[in-house]
Regions:
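Peripheral (often C-terminal) accessory segments that flank ATP-dependent C-N-forming ligase machineries
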Residues: 299-379
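ATP-binding N-terminal substructure of ATP-dependent carboxylate-amine bond-forming enzymes
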Residues: 1-113, 376-377
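Conserved protein kinase catalytic/activation segment
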Residues: 273-274
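Short glycine-enriched loops at secondary-structure junctions
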Residues: 41-46, 92-94, 118, 213-216, ...
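Active-site nucleotide/adenylate-binding loops and adjacent lid/helix of ATP-dependent enzymes
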Residues: 118-201, 212-216, 243
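Short, charged, surface-exposed secondary-structure boundary motifs
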Residues: 68-73, 114, 120-126, 172-174, ...
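ATP-dependent carboxylate/phosphate-activation module, predominantly the ATP-grasp catalytic core
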Residues: 177, 181-185, 191, 197-257, ...
């Protein structure tokens, strides 16, 4: 009997600054309704942990900051209980560890489709300017580790500038005082360095891409934001068709020999030039738009991870919209308690041993967190 394909996905936070995991899972389920989905969460309160039709099994992971050994030990314990065929990480902060663990994962039967370490390092915000020498237009930037160097910004970049965190968040600064404010906020949130990038006035485009690792582009969907949250995240958008943008995306993927998913943030400046503002090394939270546009890139990533051939797709057509919304998810406190206390939540039967791959890894202790909230009080 053929074993059910099991795909693990991280990034199940679905707030006003959502992770991509829920959208990636929705895309995979559209292509493979019978696939088993394992949700990997870093927080018990991530809404994707409890949303119906998302994960069959949800497990807590330790934060990437604890190191590769703790993260891999936990994953292999999960793998022993619910064998995983493909892992799709969706968060910036975890990518470097999963890239380092790729060979170990493969040796234990877990396939991935991730960028090479050197390409991942080059897309870091503090190294992105190096792409200029390779032929990609990138705004000038400074790497700031000491607020004492803020006065240099006026001479080297001029104002306004964009102040960016190491992993997430970006704010426009008009003055040195603004830079100092955002520097401390971002350093406290994400650590050093903080990146100061020259502000480019113009029109922003976001492009989700899937590279084959040999310089080829499997597929892409370009989008222009129509609604924004106060964090600048897309709450609505529409696909666009632009041959110059398509060529820019293909050239960037070719220069990087990018392997796996990514999101390119591109600015068409008022001067008519295209500038690469940022590369996010994973699917964006709006990736379900790719399904609506007829380019199911998450499923293509699963196929590539499994070694299956995937033909390159033409750019998506213009005029497909998405609108994000929020809703209240109702759940039992027992589900929250199961994930909080035991580190796992199951909505489907755990696979029988004869439905599992022999991974040769002992079942480790479950992640245990703090006790749940009291709901009944004495009179």
């Amino acid at each position: 009997m053929k074993r059910t394909l099991t795909i693990a996905v991280t990034g199940l936070n679905a707030t006003d600054n959502p992770g991509p995991g829920v959208a990636v899972i929705r895309a995979i389920r559209d292509a493979c309704p019978d696939c088993r989905i394992v949700g990997l969460a870093y927080e018990t309160l991530d809404p994707g942990n409890y949303m119906p039709g998302i994960a069959d099994h949800t497990y807590l992971l330790p934060y990437p900051s604890v190191g590769a050994e703790a993260l891999s030990d936990r994953l292999f314990a999960i793998h022993a209980l619910t064998p995983i065929d493909v892992l799709i990480p969706t968060l910036d902060a975890e990518l470097p560890i999963w890239v380092r663990l790729r060979d170990l994962l493969a040796a234990n039967g877990i396939a991935t489709f991730l960028p090479e370490a050197d390409a991942l390092a080059l897309r870091n915000k503090d190294h992105l300017h190096e792409l200029t020498a390779l032929g990609v237009s990138v705004p000038d930037s400074l790497v700031l580790t000491d607020p004492a160097n803020i006065p240099k910004i006026a001479d080297e970049l001029g104002y306004p500038v964009v102040v960016k965190g190491r992993f997430y968040d970006a704010y426009v600064a008009q003055t040195p005082h603004d830079v100092a404010h955002w520097f401390h906020k971002l350093a406290n949130a994400w650590g050093l360095p903080v990146i100061i990038q020259k502000f480019v006035p113009g029109t922003e485009f976001d492009v989700v891409c899937l590279g084959d690792g040999d310089g080829g582009l499997i597929g892409s969907v370009a989008m222009r934001k129509m609604q924004l949250t106060d964090k600048g995240k897309a709450w609505g958008g529409v696909t666009v068709s632009d041959k110059k943008l398509d060529a820019f995306v293909r050239d960037t993927i070719r220069i990087l020999s990018w392997r796996g998913p990514c999101e390119l943030e591109v600015m068409r400046g008022d001067d008519g030039k295209l500038y690469l503002i940022e590369i996010n090394p994973r699917f964006p939270a709006w990736v379900y738009l790719s399904v609506g546009a007829g380019r199911n890139l998450p499923w293509a990533a699963v196929q590539l991870a499994l070694g299956e051939p995937v033909a390159p797709m033409p750019p998506a057509a213009a005029g497909v919209m998405f609108l994000r919304h929020s809703r209240d998810e109702i759940l039992s406190l027992a589900d929250f308690a199961a994930l909080t206390v035991h580190g796992e939540l199951h909505r489907a039967p755990i696979p029988e041993p004869d439905d599992a791959a022999a991974v040769g890894v002992p079942q480790a202790a479950k992640v245990t967190t703090h006790a749940t909230f009291p709901t009944e009080f004495p009179a």
